[in-house]
């Protein structure tokens, strides 16, 4: 067991992501740097209205049992998690939205697809302070006009060998 004390010197939000610990890795604190150069921790994904910046704070090269996490900053009025994807066979994902105060918002869409048929489609408005958990299904998200989707994402591997960043199944209707 590790004891950790966090102290804020100004108004802030702490995000604490965790997963089952199986003896791999150590407790660590990683300070977010929005000016990090492009490289292993700062990538650009997608193109056009779904291009976004991804900051990988705890990637698969850092020793850990099951956790991966980072931040996504989408374009103004654009899509993130596009094309739609899912990774339920290996990973469960959570999004924690921030820097989207009311009236700004996005829409988190989730749905299942089987044999080319969609089911259980749901769209939820999301903004700062909202958290969405995806145990299964495709989960694209879009920002309303004048808004950027910004969220912390945490992926938890169902098995230690599934702890790999970038493994997902794209919805074949969008390939």
Where are these regions (language model features)?
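Jelly-roll (double-stranded beta-helix
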Residues: 1-175
């Amino acid at each position: 067991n590790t004891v950790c004390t966090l102290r804020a010197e100004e108004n802030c939000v702490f995000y604490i992501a965790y997963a089952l610990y199986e003896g791999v890795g150590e407790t660590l604190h990683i300070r977010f740097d929005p000016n990090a150069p492009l490289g292993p921790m700062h990538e650009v994904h997608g193109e056009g209205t779904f291009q976004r910046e991804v900051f990988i704070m705890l990637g698969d090269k850092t020793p850990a049992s099951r956790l991966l996490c980072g931040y996504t900053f989408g374009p103004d009025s654009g899509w993130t998690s596009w094309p739609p994807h899912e990774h339920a066979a290996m990973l469960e994902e959570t999004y924690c939205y921030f820097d989207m105060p009311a009236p700004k918002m996005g829409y988190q869409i989730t749905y299942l697809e089987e044999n080319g048929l969609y089911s259980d489609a749901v769209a939820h408005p999301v903004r700062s302070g909202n958290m969405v958990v995806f145990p299964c299904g495709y989960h694209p998200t879009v920002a309303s006009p004048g808004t950027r989707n910004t969220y912390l994402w945490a992926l938890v591997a169902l098995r230690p060998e599934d702890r790999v960043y970038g493994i997902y199944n794209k919805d074949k209707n969008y390939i």
